[in-house]
Amino acid sequence: MTREGPEAASEIVARIGRSLPPHARLHDLVDLLGDRAGGILLAVIAIPAIIPVPGVPLGVVFGTVLTVIACRMVRAGARPGLPRWLGQIHLKAPAIMLLSRRGPALLRPIEHRLRPRASLLLAGSIRPPLALVMALMGILIALPIPFGNTLPGFAVILMGLGLALGDGLAVLGALILAALATGVSVALGWAAVAGVAQLLA
């Protein structure tokens, strides 16, 4: 498998629990991943959307982080980062441990199937629209839609790894998954609103 940088994303995630300082904040996680490709950064941050932690609103926190970083990536050449107020949010220890323990098993099967191909889908002019799609996925993850995190989370992971590893077909697949995720989220949100309205009627 061709990699971006000295470590695969799964290897980076596996050592997060050991590398982050005690009482880590969001900016510590971004700093740990900041020298990696922006795609890997987004893929790693999307993992908590797929691995829920009871009682911890990871979707809201990490969905917001995804949206902010993706919006910053719209600017060509901008280094992904967080505004100061967002970077000060504390990371719960259960979230860090779950990310480092279960994240690698989630990423490895995807990484092993990716390789450089379909480079036309990775042209520099395409990157800003792709970042906007990832920002939309971050918004969907942050919204309190029942079961609405999984598809957007997988779309971001697939697109992030596709960008980092130069796999244009993975990026295309992520766009299709993002379209599906948007449709499903709209349907779930509409059903939830209709259900609440019926209860209040």
Question: Predicted regions span which residues?
Answer:
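Alpha-helical transmembrane segments of helical membrane proteins, especially in multi-pass transport
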Residues: R101-P152
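Hydrophobic alpha-helical transmembrane segments
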Residues: T2-V13, A70-R84, S119-A131
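Interfacial segments of multi-pass membrane proteins
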Residues: V65, R72, P152-L169
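Cytosolic-side membrane-entry/anchor segment at the start of a transmembrane helix
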Residues: M1-I51, L175-A179, V184, A191
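Hydrophobic alpha-helical membrane-embedded segments
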Residues: V53-H90
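Membrane-proximal soluble regions of multi-pass membrane proteins
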Residues: T2-E7, A14, R18, L91-L120
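Transmembrane alpha-helix interface/packing and boundary motifs in multi-pass membrane proteins
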Residues: I45-F62, M137-G148, P152, L163
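Juxtamembrane boundary at the C-terminal end of a transmembrane helix
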Residues: S185-A201
